[in-house]
């Protein structure tokens, strides 16, 4: 696999990668066991080293978050700095101008977006109208289920959402119990970059409030998953009943500090009211 263009030392591939290429599987994840090589310590010193050896032109990347909530901003910035191009991004939205996945749109590194709500990014609309960006729109629930199905190894499913609309054009329609359903194919990605509130060194993740959003399902649907976390603790510290994403789905972790809490929309009363 081509190396990242970031000038950093590659800490070495996980156990599921050999001879500088990813082992090919038709569906689902490559693997998630680093026990032999890293003694289950999946923590990398920074985003550069965590993504080293994983990035290439034309790859498909899932990015967690909803708006600017729960986005892996350090990892996204590192993808931008790597210079990879022709990317297909799977994300609920495209960030905003100057933040989130909007950074990758500004540098014209994205070829296609598989998304749901994109109305907050003016550049996104401009690129689409100029024919410089391919878009695959999805109802939001359908997008989430396509990702969940990909992580579960389910190749496709039927849903009533979108029947009789542009969403259903070119897709198989079937009758079940007198109701029409459209077939949707599942989604998997070469790489999933996600954000979590807390993790232990074995990759068990806890999300905080609405920042959970698309992160858990994307963790399962990436052939390689890299998590950006706010708090890092030792194994055994997190109550098993509180774990949202088990470590088996996480390959690499970075402890992200000095994160900026961005407010997408702020509405307050006028002074004196």
Spans of model-derived segments:
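Conserved alpha/beta enzyme-core scaffold
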Residues: 34-273
């Amino acid at each position: 696999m081509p190396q990242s263009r970031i000038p950093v030392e590659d800490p070495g591939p996980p156990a599921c990668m050999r001879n500088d290429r990813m082992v090919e599987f038709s569906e689902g994840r490559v693997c998630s066991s680093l026990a032999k090589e890293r003694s289950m310590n999946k923590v990398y010193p920074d985003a550069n080293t965590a993504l080293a050896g994983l990035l290439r032109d034309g790859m498909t990347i899932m990015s967690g978050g909803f708006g600017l909530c729960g986005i892996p901003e350090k990892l996204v910035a590192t993808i931008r700095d790597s210079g990879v191009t022709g990317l297909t991004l799977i994300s609920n939205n495209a960030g905003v101008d100057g933040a989130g996945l909007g950074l990758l749109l500004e540098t014209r590194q994205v070829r296609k977006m598989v998304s749901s709500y994109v109305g907050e990014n003016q550049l996104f609309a401009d690129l689409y109208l100029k024919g410089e960006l391919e878009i695959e729109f999805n109802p939001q629930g359908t997008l989430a289920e396509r990702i969940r199905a990909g992580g579960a190894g389910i190749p496709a499913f039927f849903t009533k959402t979108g029947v009789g609309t542009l969403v259903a054009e070119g897709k198989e329609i079937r009758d079940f119990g007198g109701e029409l359903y459209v077939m949707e194919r599942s989604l998997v990605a070469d790489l999933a970059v996600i954000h979590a509130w807390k993790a232990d060194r074995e990759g068990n993740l806890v999300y905080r409030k609405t920042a959970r959003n698309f992160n858990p399902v994307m963790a399962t649907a990436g052939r390689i998953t890299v998590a950006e976390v706010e708090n890092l603790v030792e194994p055994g510290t997190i109550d098993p009943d509180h774990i949202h994403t088990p470590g088996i789905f996480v390959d690499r972790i970075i402890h992200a500090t000095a994160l900026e809490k961005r407010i997408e929309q702020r509405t307050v009363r006028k002074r004196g009211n």
